[in-house]
Amino acid sequence: MDVDSIKEKANSADENITFTDDACETLTQVPDFAMDMAINHMVNAAKDQGVDTVDTAFLEANNPMG
């Protein structure tokens, strides 16, 4: 999935959570079949932690794959 598609999908997942351009670039490494699950995981983690912007540091800190 390309960066622009990821950016659109990620930033429409929740109106209160924004994904940075760098975070969306990092998400290009996620296989297409797992993209919705990855975005939903990050949105839920952001909500749980009171975060409104998902950046690369947040992705790394909350990566369920370690």
Residue ranges and their predicted role:
Residues 1-66:
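Non-catalytic accessory segments flanking P-loop/AAA+ NTPase cores
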